[in-house]
Structures are given as structure tokens and as C-alpha cells.
Amino acid sequence: MPDLFAYTDGACSGNPGPGGWGALLRAMDGETVLKERELKGGEKETTNNRMELLAAIHALESLARPSKITVVTDSAYVKNGVTGWIFGWKKNGWKTSAKKPVKNVELWQRLDAAQSRHDVTWEWVKGHAGHPENERADELARAGMAPFKSSGKSSKG
């Protein structure tokens, strides 16, 4: 059975502002790439954190069947949220420890549902540090953002 990886990234021009998300999905056999798929999309008015979340969500939602997958992100917000904070938020009715509503709650709930179908390992990598797959996810996120720098649409592809 191949090893599955999803490399995800979000980008924003201004925060808030036009933004994009990108995901590179790979099925690997050791060092050999068996299959690769690229996903991207964006929004006219968003935040970097929302784009980071959507990259991970779309990567997991794109899998046709329950899978064992490693999701690699350069977002400490996503990694820390999904592997730690989310358990307290759910226990507290989606409120933070300060009793405030969780920001981007609808995306966190969607990510929680998406990952519940799979056996997910989460890894963090430093962004813009020469990690080729993370750099490709960044390129996809920027490509996903490009149409929204001058229009008011939302896209997924």
C-alpha cells in the first residue's frame, strides 16, 4: 500500500485580503512518486489562517476513501489547533479557554469532520525554507489567489 502525503499551504495578499490555498497530494512507494494531484482555490476577502485551514480541508475531503495520510503544513495555527486546541474547544462547546468563540469555527468543524474519516498524522515544516513540496503548495496557493486580486469571485479547482 502506498504512503499518502498532503502538503498544504495558504497565502494572502493583505490580511484580510485576497487569498488562496494549495495542496499537493502524493502517493509514494519509498522515494518513488506513484501518483500526484494538485488542488487550489481562493477567495476575494479572507485571511491567511482561513486559507491554511481550507488547504488542509480540501486535501482531506478530496480523498475518495478512508486513508492513512500524513498532512504536512507550515502553519503552526493548523498543526497546533488540530492536534491540541481542538479537544478543549469541542469540550467547551467551541469556546476558547477564555470562554470566547473559536475563530473560524465553521472551518475547524469542517476540518474535524474531514480528518475523522482518515488516519491522519500531522507534521509541521518551516515555510519558505527550501522544502520542495511545501514550496509547490505555496505556488499553488498563490495561483489560487491570483484571480481574486482583481475580481470578487470565489473559486475551487
UniProtKB/Swiss-Prot annotation:
What is the enzyme's main class?
hydrolase
Q: Which reaction does it catalyse?
A: Endonucleolytic cleavage to 5'-phosphomonoester
**What subcellular locations does the record give?**
Cytoplasm
Residue positions binding Mg(2+) 1:
D9, E52, D74
> EC number(s) per UniProt?
3.1.26.4
Could you tell me the keywords of this UniProt record? Cytoplasm, Endonuclease, Hydrolase, Magnesium, Metal-binding, Nuclease
Residues the entry annotates as binding Mg(2+) 2: D9, D138
Q: Which CDD domains match?
A: RNase_HI_prokaryote_like (cd09278)
> GO molecular function terms here?
magnesium ion binding; nucleic acid binding; RNA-DNA hybrid ribonuclease activity
Q: Which Gene3D superfamilies match?
A: Ribonuclease H-like superfamily/Ribonuclease H
Task: Give the cofactors, semicolon-separated.
Answer: Mg(2+)
* Family matches, as Pfam families: RNase_H (PF00075)
Gene Ontology CC entries for this record: cytoplasm
Classification via InterPro entries: RNase_H, RNaseH-like_sf, RNaseH_domain, RNaseH_sf, RNaseHI
Q: Which SUPFAM superfamilies match?
A: Ribonuclease H-like
PANTHER family in the cross-refs: RIBONUCLEASE H1
Q: What does this protein do?
A: Endonuclease that specifically degrades the RNA of RNA-DNA hybrids.
User: Which protein family is it in?
Assistant: Belongs to the RNase H family.
Q: How does it assemble?
A: Monomer.
Q: Which NCBIfam families match?
A: PRK00203.1
Name by which UniProt lists this protein: Ribonuclease H
